[in-house]
Every structure is written in structure tokens, then in C-alpha cells.
């Protein structure tokens, strides 16, 4: 889910576009599940994903790069300048209690 990277870390995501609200909704096969209101048309959901993560992580969009999964629901993003622990500390407060435990469990596996 959250793995160290020489530039910071990577985050594996399972994205559900066209949802009622933008939210962290759970985990799925080792990925953090996100719902986005934007439909998956012309890359708009990918842009919305970067914007959502930038707001969540309090980073400029330029420091978040989609490195895998441009046309897939399973995506990997590189987050430049934040460690796995820093990302975890920013993501977990926005998740439900069950999701928090899953995120903690998954991130501990990859450290």
C-alpha cells in the first residue's frame, strides 16, 4: 500500500470514479480504496485523483505523479518528499476506524 521510494514513497490505490463523494473508503488487495466524484472520462478521474491526494497530503500537485495505471482502477502514485510514515500520518485521520487498522497493518508489512 505505502512503500518507500528513493524520492519519497509510493502509494497503491484502487480508485472508484463516479462516486457520490471523494473519500477514502477501505482497502482492496493491498491497495487503499478511494472514491472520486469525477467520471473516468478523458483522464479527468486521474486529474481528480492527483488533486484529492494533493489536498489530503498538503502538497503541490507537482509532487504527486501517477506512475502506473493510467487507464486502470488500480493505480500507483509516487509522492515526492514525504516518507511512508508521513503519508500514513496524513491518510489515517481521514479514514474510518476499520480502514485505519487496515492501512496500519498493510504499511507495516512494507517497511
Predicted regions, residues:
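Contiguous, often N-terminal, cationic amphipathic patches that form binding interfaces
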Residues: 1-51, 58-61, 65-70, 75-111
